């Protein structure tokens, strides 16, 4: 939620509930599950999230097919705002204070 909020503050339009969706695959069928869904799922999601021994997030915040996303985040400034949003979200997760921007 921290990352979704930071990306929204940086100018991104959020998709899903508060910018968070879970995706599960059953064979070839893709199923989106909104963040408000509380049922424990047995289906695997993405291997990168399932087979790691540390906290992991797979984030997708911009689409190259979206003129709005490209305009907001395709520049050097947009990349810096995105990097800052990720950095601050990671700091919040580990309960550390981010260093000030230069």
Q: How would you describe each model-predicted region?
A:
Residues 1-102:
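Active-site-proximal helix/loop segments of hydrolytic enzymes
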């Amino acid at each position: 939620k921290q990352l979704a909020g930071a990306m929204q503050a940086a100018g991104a339009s959020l998709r899903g509930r508060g910018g968070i969706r879970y995706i599960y695959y059953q064979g070839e069928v893709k199923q989106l599950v909104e963040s408000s869904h509380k049922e424990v799922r047995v289906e695997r999601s993405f291997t990168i999230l399932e087979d790691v021994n540390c906290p992991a997030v797979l984030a997708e915040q911009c689409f190259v097919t979206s003129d709005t996303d490209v305009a907001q985040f395709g520049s050097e400034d947009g990349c810096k705002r995105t990097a800052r949003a990720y950095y601050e979200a990671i700091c919040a997760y580990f309960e550390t204070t981010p260093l000030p921007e230069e």
